[in-house]
Amino acid sequence: MKITFAKVLLGFILLLGLIQIIPVDRSNPPVEEEIAASSEVQAILKPACYDCHSNETIWPWYSQVAPVSWLLAWDVHEGREELNFSTWNRYSPKKRNKYIKESWEEVEEGEMPPWFYLPLHPEASLSYQDRTVLREWAKSVLTPNEDEDED
């Protein structure tokens, strides 16, 4: 039996249709309390960080389409596990210091927001001025003499 391009394409389309029935968690749990930051800092953090690092994720249309939906749900889950601005007050001062320092290092090194996020979310791109504002905010909220050993 000869497999034609049309049959392969039809099989692919059917498979793509079938995987849409696999459920994906795109929930946004309640926000416990906003991180204490100025409106200027919030205006930078929200578009650049909150889709992955808060319970205020704005799920784009393509988050409804498998297999992309699986990847997005996983990225958000991992981002919230690592740092969640919506549960900031649960963290001890030591942990907050650790997160602020690590976050700033990742921003300064260009690791956050991730390169693959920016093409579809250009509003998340951080300008020099944005990074300066975040750096000054980070310096102002770091608690002196807090040990970083806590995980």
Predicted regions and their residues:
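C-terminal capping alpha-helices of c-type cytochrome domains
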Residues: 110-111, 118, 122-148
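Extracytoplasmic/periplasmic C-terminal soluble domains
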Residues: 74-80, 144-151
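Hydrophobic membrane-insertion alpha-helices, especially the h-region
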Residues: 6-23
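The canonical Cys-X-X-Cys-His
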Residues: 45-57, 112, 134
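Extracytoplasmic electron-transfer domains, predominantly the class I c-type cytochrome c fold
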Residues: 70-120
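Electrostatic cytochrome c docking/interface patches
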Residues: 25-45
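Extracytoplasmic/secreted proteins, especially bacterial periplasmic and envelope-associated proteins
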Residues: 40, 44, 67, 71, ...
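Short cysteine/histidine-rich zinc-coordinating motifs and their immediately flanking basic loops
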Residues: 61-67
